[in-house]
């Protein structure tokens, strides 16, 4: 399975959002460990936990973006909705798999979820925050 490590470059400069991203990574590290231990029940619970936490994170993030008048908020909200839909599909596919190896590979697809959110989606927010002087470049 892939290695999951927090990098300072992932930070967007808003503590609450950065803390959420770290927690999402921690849950994914737990998913990885459960997959390696072939603990499918724990892995399935953690997939649910990751999606639940992500939903709450997206709500917090969208509220903050609304408060700072982020110009692409509606696009970002739609992006979050798409990520959640894809994550739910991956989760259900993982739960239906019978082979341990295929299950671990399926769980790895979920890792793209955080990477997609942090790298693709939230780096645009980071640029906006830095342009506005709300966050310092790191």
Regions found by a protein language model. Give the residues of each.
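Small-residue-biased structural context
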Residues: 1-138
